[in-house]
């Protein structure tokens, strides 16, 4: 696949400086007419993975191959046009980055875009590309999608190949993606899931009452038509309570495990290299330790 330089206007500060490339995908494939960007946690061959940190790339070799999911998208015909800004080592939920700058929110100028997949969300909302690759450990696809008014999906953990993605908390890490339309979101999903999805599913749909109860009335009203359409695709629909002891306990457990795992992920790097960090990231790592 040929790699060439490509100039992209970046009014929303979504892109990593110097990452304006064009890697052409295969022809006559399901995604051949689509352009995409990737969050700068995914390896792209011959480009440093910066991960939102001034010292991460200098302590890691430049990758000589693409992340597995990037290769999958290129093989499906999509054209890669650059890498996007992330919260520092992906530890953030607002999209702020002291070193690379904070991407603008195209949907709401003057507000943060959400993180940590901030640049990927801004690039899609700002019409740089058709879709963007991102990651989600504790909300890093879902929050930016909400803030920027676009579609985003966090697949089931373990569903997609994460080889070539910088880990944060492995028991929660997933890849995900953004798009401006449901049709594009679906096209990408059919490629990444590597299976045909029938028009009607011979399975049961479980609707988590306790989870929906956490949403405000406006959110529940907005979701109702989509939930009704989704219900018609399944053989059986059942309402359940996911957490018998309450979702607050699940949330607290997830935060505790995630903090312990990201300390395991980064502690050796910190001890060896004493990297520069923003106050908020240093504080979070100190608490996790």
How would you describe each model-predicted region?
Residues 47-49, 90-99, 278-282:
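Short, flexible, mixed-charge acidic loops at enzyme active sites
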Residues 32-41, 72-76, 81-83:
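Acidic-leg catalytic submotif of subtilisin-like serine proteases
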Residues 57-59, 107-108, 172-179, 208-218:
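Flexible, glycine/proline-enriched loop segments at strand-loop-helix junctions
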Residues 1-62, 66-67, 89-92:
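Short, well-ordered alpha-helical
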Residues 1-26, 30-31, 194-289:
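Amidase signature
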Residues 64-68, 118, 145-148, 180-190, ...:
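Conserved active-site and cofactor/substrate-binding residues in soluble primary-metabolism enzymes
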Residues 74-189:
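Short glycine/serine-rich loop segments
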Residues 51-57, 102-108, 287-289:
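Short, basic, glycine/proline-bearing loop/turn elements
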């Amino acid at each position: 696949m040929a790699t060439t330089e490509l100039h992209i206007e970046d009014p929303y500060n979504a892109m990593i400086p110097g990452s304006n490339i064009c890697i052409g995908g295969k022809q006559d494939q399901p995604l051949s007419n689509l352009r995409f960007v990737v969050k700068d946690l995914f390896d792209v061959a011959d480009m440093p993975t910066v991960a939102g940190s001034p010292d991460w790339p200098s302590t890691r070799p430049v990758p000589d191959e693409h992340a597995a999911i990037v290769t999958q998208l290129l093989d499906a015909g999509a054209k890669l046009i650059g890498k996007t800004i992330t919260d520092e080592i992906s530890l953030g939920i607002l999209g702020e980055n002291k070193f690379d700058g904070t991407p603008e929110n195209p949907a709401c100028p003057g507000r943060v875009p959400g993180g940590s997949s901030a640049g990927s969300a801004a690039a899609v909302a700002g019409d740089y590309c058709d879709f963007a690759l991102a990651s989600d450990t504790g909300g890093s696809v879902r929050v930016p999608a909400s803030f920027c008014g676009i579609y985003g999906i966090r697949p089931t953990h373990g569903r997609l190949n994460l080889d070539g993605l910088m880990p944060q908390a492995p028991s929660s890490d997933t890849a995900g993606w953004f798009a401006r339309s449901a049709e594009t979101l679906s096209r990408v999903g059919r490629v990444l899931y590597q299976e045909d999805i029938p028009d009607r599913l011979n399975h049961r749909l479980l609707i988590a009452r306790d989870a929906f109860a956490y949403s405000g009335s406006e959110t529940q009203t907005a979701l109702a038509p989509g939930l009704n359409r989704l219900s018609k695709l399944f053989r059986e629909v059942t309402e359940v309570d996911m957490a018998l002891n309450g979702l607050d306990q699940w949330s607290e457990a997830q935060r505790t495990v995630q903090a312990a795992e990201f300390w395991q992920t980064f502690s050796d790097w910190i001890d060896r290299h004493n990297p520069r960090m923003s106050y908020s990231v240093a504080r979070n790592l100190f608490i996790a330790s």
